Structures are given as structure tokens and as C-alpha cells.
Amino acid sequence: MEVALYLLPVTLGDTAIEKVLPSYNREIIVNIKHFIVEDVRSARRFLKKVDADICIDELTFYPLNKHTSPEAISGYLAPLAEGHSMGVISEAGCPAVADPGADVVAIAQKRNFKVVPLVGPSSIILSVMGSGFNGQSFAFHGYLPIEPADRMRRLKELEARVYSENQTQLFIETPYRNHKMLEDILKTCRPQTKLCIAANITCEGEFIQTKTVKEWKGKLPELNKIPCIFSIYK
């Protein structure tokens, strides 16, 4: 196996590994001893799902989150400099996409280390695929402002981009606030603007549906505490 920084996708929920990850990923993972991870506990759980025989005590984990300093991240790559492959694991989906993993990849690229992204589920890409919206030009904005006035202003800005740039706009909300987000979208966006709701992607109860804002009114699904991506287009 070539020495590299491997970007290791994980499942988006309790989905069976074989449903969303190729067997090649396992071949890579079982040969790595150093992992840079967003959450140590969930990373250990994922690795045991990949191979129950993995000896967790023989592995080294380096926590990576929004509080990790650039200096610490740079130090994490010491095993790679010494010729040992490393893996990057997010809490869900693909590392380095809307994820702290991007910081370690940037440092690896700057230091000319080989970076190898592996195949796996991305809720952003899958929601675009299932929406019927423009897949050539789209933007993911993460969380919108919590303050109602700021949020509605931001929604109007994103909707304006839909019509001026023909660009799909994607964003998320903390699962327990999904319904409030939907209410704000329906109050703020034009009746003809299309809204795709993509919830529980790849998991049991997956729901991906596109309707106009007008069509959604009075017919919203129950999304409380369910991971969800919202996207709008014309």
C-alpha cells in the first residue's frame, strides 16, 4: 500500500457498511495505524464496523475539530513524514467536505504528501443527485443564521442567486430545528421556487422529494431530529 494521507468516508447513519462503502476501503483501513478523527469514540465504532478484528488499542488517534490549532494539525502529520500512512475520519460522510478535515489536507498538500480520497457517501452530492436541480453549478452554505431577521435575509440572498446565476443552493439546520427552517423557507421564498428536502440519506426512512414552495405549504413531512439537507432552485 502506498504511503499517503487517506481520506476515509464513513456511513451517514446506522447503514450497513457494505451498502455504501466499497470493499477496497477496508483493505486500506486495516493497514493504517494512525487516524486523524473528528470524534474519537465514533471513529473507533466505525473501525470496528469495518473489521471486528481491528485492535483499537494498537491505533493512535489525533482529534481534529474547530478548536484544534494549525500547529497541532501540522504536528499530527509526523507519522506520515516518517513513512506511515494515515487516515482522516469525519463523524459522518466524506472527510474534508464541509468538514474540519480540509485543514489537515491543506497542510498535507503544502508539504507535498500524497493525498488519496476514497469513495463513499456524501450527503451533499447525493441530495443534489436526487433533487433534479442544477448539478453543474451548486453551492453548499452549511448553517444559516439563527436570528430570524438575519436568516430570512440570507434566504432571500440565496434565492436571488438561484435566479441570477442558475445555481442550486444547499444548506442545513440542527435537526431539532428542521421544522422552523421549513417554516421560514415557506414564508420567505417565492411560491414558484423549488425546494428539495433530503432527509436520512442512505438510511432507513430515507426521504428525498422536490416540490415548489407553494406545493409544500400544508404538506410538510415530519423531520424532527432527522439529519436533513435543504436545497432550492428554480
Put a short name on every predicted segment:
Residues M1-L64:
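Glycine-rich, flexible N-terminal cofactor/catalytic loop recognition
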Residues E2-Y6, H84-S85, S164-K234:
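A contiguous loop/helix-start segment that scaffolds small-molecule binding in enzyme catalytic cores
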Residues Y6, D103-R161:
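Class I SAM-dependent methyltransferase SAM-binding "motif I" and its flanking Rossmann-like core
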Residues L12-D14, E91-P95, P175-Y176:
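Short glycine-rich anion-binding loops that position phosphate/pyrophosphate groups of nucleotides
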Residues I29-F35, N112-V116, T168-Q169:
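Short active-site oxyanion
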Residues I36-V37, G87-G93, T168-E173:
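Acidic beta-strand-to-loop metal/phosphate-binding motif
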Residues Y62-S69, L144-P148:
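Conserved helicase motor
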Residues N65, I73-V115:
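Glycine/small-residue-rich loop that forms an oxyanion/phosphate-binding "nest" at active or ligand-binding sites
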